[in-house]
Amino acid sequence: RTALAFNDNGTKEIGQIATRLNLDLDYRFTATERLHAFMRPLDRNGNFSRCEFFGNDETGCDSVLNANIEAFFFEGDLGAIVSGINDNYVSWDLPFSIGLMPLLFQNGVWVEDAFTGLAFTIPAMNSKTLDITNVDITFFAGFDDVSTSGVVAVDGSSTEDDVNIYGVTAFVDAMQGYWEVGYGYTDGQDAFDDSDYHNFTFAFTKRYRNKISNSIRFISNVGQNLVGRSETADGYLLLIENSLITSKPSTFIP
């Protein structure tokens, strides 16, 4: 991504061009198993490599290099692996991933993070009786690089190393809509041991007359019991999202 801009902030004027590079790297073992890595070598902590070349306050070029690996994980299908080892067809699928992996649930409102852990999914279930066309259930756990503002020390500092997370979420196509329910347990370790709490999530999304898409989301944090201080993860969020449906719903959403 590259952007050209002139910023006039009253006391400061800068014209600049800035860029960001996303690198997705794959090594495929089979059609269903691969190693994946993701890097952003030209930006770090919200600062982009850029050149300031006009304006009263231009300072030249600044390279913001970043050698950190943002994601590195293995993913595959246990059913396909078992089939290959035994040289026999199996009728079940169990996709999984392990490593530093990005996960997104509830449109990023509940979870949007890359942490070190594992996840697996029981896919493609259905029920004619309940009018359910598809159900996917995903179990996940994270043991490092878990970011949450709900786990803080007495001095207010946060951590990504002393927090574990365990959860399950289900995606259900039913009643001509899309349901998403989930549960998570955030487990603080060592100095953050009293910061544990539970998460409950629910969402329903549906299109109406092919004109508007509506989502209703509910997310709750409960059960935290900090010693001698106020809770940092105690409350709920009710969010209503609306968007118009266009002729290109995958690329243009007003």
Protein language model regions, located:
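Beta-barrel outer-membrane channel/assembly domains of diderm bacteria
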Residues: 1-83, 125-129
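Signature for the C-terminal beta-barrel architecture of outer-membrane proteins
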Residues: 77-80, 93-95, 101-253
